[in-house]
């Protein structure tokens, strides 16, 4: 169906609202996706963004991160608190919160006295924002270390941070989505997509973020690609068998003749 002038005007208006910070690249560019059966589940397939997973992104919190809110770079992406994915997520986190102590959680007294959860305007439960950021966020200068106290707890106990932090926190900036696919032979498979959590992943408000790292050149200088540096998180999201197959495909891509097909635009030139 041909697009009407009204539809085009509305689309243009929406585009005008998009905010891209100084060192960020645009959201729309060629990507190399690969689809493969889940080795551990015949009724499931993975669809993975190799452009993202072989990119050289890395977290630069505390070393160049500009933060999602202007003037609050020290908060990183923790300014709004974290929404729980479900009741199990909240219960899991609560078990680890119980082990936090004042020496590693700056707001321990406030959190234990007045609570560490809250509800947003729509009634969804989340970690409580306190003084402009997540209540678990230790501010610069705190003796126990700046940053997420749940992350600090995990490192102190020799755990992976994905064990102690809310789902959304440890998954960022990898995004997992699900879609049932109806095939021509009347069968169905669950398609699990693993890709980049860009500004759009936040919903309409994502375009209003002060800065976002996945498309920023300053956050694309890691020695290892994402599929290597995020191994624990990807294994948790995909299972060991699925991750192992992903590694094979990523290695095949990187071993191919340069330049790569559809490289991430924020990566260093020459890849």
UniProtKB/Swiss-Prot annotation:
Coiled-coil region list: none
Basic and acidic residues biased stretches: 7-21
Domain of life: Bacteria
Region Disordered, residue ranges: 1-21, 109-130
Known function: Essential for maintaining intracellular redox homeostasis.
Family: Belongs to the Rv0495c family.
Protein name from the UniProt record: Probable redox regulatory protein SCO3349
Organism expressing this protein natively: Streptomyces coelicolor (strain ATCC BAA-471 / A3(2) / M145)
